[in-house]
């Protein structure tokens, strides 16, 4: 059994443990994923591969991650499309921006993408989002069309705490988001 653990407690301009793609960058202790313009894509990836699947045994590892984020938009009605925490092959490249959140190119299921994402979706896309039109947190498997969603009441400018956990024995991925203040 192998354990991988790391902690990124501060961001800075010389961030060695992250790979930035597209518009992603760090400055002033902040990670910024996109510019304030339409259809941009920015990503930050951990620089060392993390093995969660053993190709010899087929076993999948449990994992837990936690992070804090703030969406600080000029107004609470126009906050772009959102962002994702995702797990993908190490050679993954940025995909289509906008509603595809830089992770997918199509709403159709694609088993070759080998991607699992938790989306924090702030914009209703009629082609694949839940019909209620709410902002939501979704679990995506090889497609931007979520296999499970829960409505999310975004608190613009407020710090949110997230915990994402996968239990390999039950094959269940859970997501928790709280606003501490």
Swiss-Prot record:
GO terms of molecular function: D-mannose binding; metal ion binding
Taxonomic superkingdom: Eukaryota
Binding positions for Mn(2+) per the UniProt entry: 119, 121, 129, 136
Binding residues annotated for Ca(2+), in chain numbering: 121, 123, 125, 129
Entry keywords, A to Z: Calcium, Lectin, Manganese, Mannose-binding, Metal-binding
Similarity comment: Belongs to the leguminous lectin family.
PANTHER family: CONCANAVALIN A-LIKE LECTIN FAMILY PROTEIN, LECTIN
Subunit structure: Tetramer of two alpha and two beta chains.
Miscellaneous notes: Binds one manganese (or another transition metal) ion and one calcium ion. The metal ions are essential for the saccharide-binding and cell-agglutinating activities. The sequence shown is that of the beta-1.
The protein's name: Lectin beta-1 and beta-2 chains
Native species: Lathyrus ochrus
Top-level taxonomy: Eukaryota, Viridiplantae, Streptophyta, Embryophyta, Tracheophyta
């Amino acid at each position: 059994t192998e354990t991988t653990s790391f902690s990124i407690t501060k961001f800075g301009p010389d961030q060695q443990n992250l790979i930035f793609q597209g518009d992603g960058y760090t400055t002033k202790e902040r990670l910024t994923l996109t510019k304030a313009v339409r259809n941009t894509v920015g990503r930050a990836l951990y620089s060392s591969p993390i093995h969660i699947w053993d190709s010899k045994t087929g076993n999948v590892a449990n994992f837990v991650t936690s992070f804090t984020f703030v969406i600080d938009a000029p107004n609470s009605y126009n906050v772009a499309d959102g962002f994702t925490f995702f797990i993908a092959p190490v050679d993954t490249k940025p995909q289509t921006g906008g509603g595809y959140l830089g992770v997918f190119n199509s709403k159709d299921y694609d088993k070759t993408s080998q991607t699992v994402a938790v989306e924090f979706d702030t914009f209703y896309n009629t082609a694949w989002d839940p019909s209620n039109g709410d902002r939501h947190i979704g679990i995506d498997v090889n497609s931007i069309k979520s296999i499970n969603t829960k409505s999310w009441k975004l608190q613009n400018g407020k710090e949110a705490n997230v915990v994402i956990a996968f239990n390999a024995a039950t094959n269940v991925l859970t997501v928790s988001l709280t606003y501490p203040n």
